[in-house]
């Protein structure tokens, strides 16, 4: 067994191999305090040279036993991956993928498994380190090692590898992955931090991760790792020359078109024409199958060369130019809030629904349970790109894009005591030509304001790109689909006028420098301000809450009355909920939150709650029920368990000889409180009637009223 050690978050970090999962091609167990992660990697022995992509799969998984828990549900076992597991799988995949050799077509599967967990320690960076170590000691060709470090920021100081308890108050939560020389991946959110703070965190993280890269190299040296040369896919050199000579000009002429559909049609026609020509020169079907791949490589070179050397983008924009933007709000009836954001040929329809506390999503994992009251779901149907495709449950990409957009708003959402609604945002991508996740953020800002959500600030997002060619590079603002596909970087930045709120960096190179990121951030800031101007011109402040949204009221109740409101076994509060259909949340502090489907129901719910918790006061009017009748008056229940006396002289303006001339037991009667003494209530029906013009109170009524008997 081989073991290497370092320090992580002030604790001993151990990487070991040779004990667990020895049949895997690479197996590393990471230990940090009570956290244990087993990362395994296996690769197919033979390449699939007919594949046009590298088949890498990462399946990060958390076992419930790691946190000493039994899964919920009927089957009591782990099932499909939870969103969190998918998101961490993506965090691991993204920095590792660029470091495999170009043309490597062996299928690779990485499975990091959390075996035990310290619930105050995030596992994503650790799982990435373990996965990289497993690759590094395996026979699989890999240009690593890679390491990851999380950085927090509080009170003007950075926190290296903060724990979960520290992240709750941190202004920054950024995870940075990199190699010895460059940055490979960035992911996280912030509370409107500046670009300077952001870059400082990246530079600190890259410096800190070097020791985790060194320990992986040490482990590989101790294991005596030898990489096995694999057959890499390469295009036939003579065929490349033939396709280039005949087809480069055709591909270049098809490249420049501001319309995505027309450009794709022109490019497809060029590819097909080139393939038909090659068929007249070549009979080998395997060679012919390479033609379109070669055409695609030529297209990539043309796009990069034009951008870097001529500052020409495929759609004719300047390098820092944003596509035309149009915005609309409140275009969908009946929903609680809606907005449409269109940027070029990317279009997002965002819909907001407001709900009560019971609509919150219960998050249950190895770290415990919590209620999630803000959700943003991103949908990317195949028609958005003019294709027929799978339609159903969200895939990994949709979950990742939705999570990024959701995190963009965490810094600007109103506190629960001011806006206690559960908020669900659904982003429907209706057209896509790149940067759809950033369009989601822009559309969702407007739909949230449209729904009456008082955001602390508007949020906008922009996707920055990078094109490299020979020794040069150019940074692109607002990349479209072809620039994302053929370029080297997709750097998504979201934020307000004050600062950055969320970010995500993916690259196809073996790393980029902090200087390139600085330049990209500066351009992104200008673009963000431009888009925020467009949003503010459409809707700058929160509107009125929709008539179709639940109505909300907070009541402050004497904590001593809470038991009365709840009742034995919850009898009273259940009766209120059943009668009104409202959602009522009661806190021990006496705060009662009420959500009702409409205003009349809300008023009724408040009235019923007051019937248990409010002390009646002089002058108030109640709808009561006659409980008992005596010669001198009627006892009327005005609140549950609270009765008052309506004296016979207070039944009517006319002389009443017998109480039952006016009231009978069980009658409903509206009464007004005349007096409260020692917890006894004097009531009047007469006070709510119209007084006759010739009425004169009789003396015997005064005397009888004064000396009448009372029952309490």
From Swiss-Prot:
S1 motif domain sequence ranges: 619-686
Keyword Magnesium: yes
MF terms (GO), sorted A to Z: 3'-5'-RNA exonuclease activity; magnesium ion binding; polyribonucleotide nucleotidyltransferase activity; RNA binding
Binding site for Mg(2+): 484, 490
Cofactor(s), by name: Mg(2+)
KH domain ranges (all copies): 550-609
Enzyme class at the top of the EC tree: transferase
UniProt function note: Involved in mRNA degradation. Catalyzes the phosphorolysis of single-stranded polyribonucleotides processively in the 3'- to 5'-direction.
Protein name: Polyribonucleotide nucleotidyltransferase
Species in which this protein is naturally found: Brachyspira hyodysenteriae (strain ATCC 49526 / WA1)
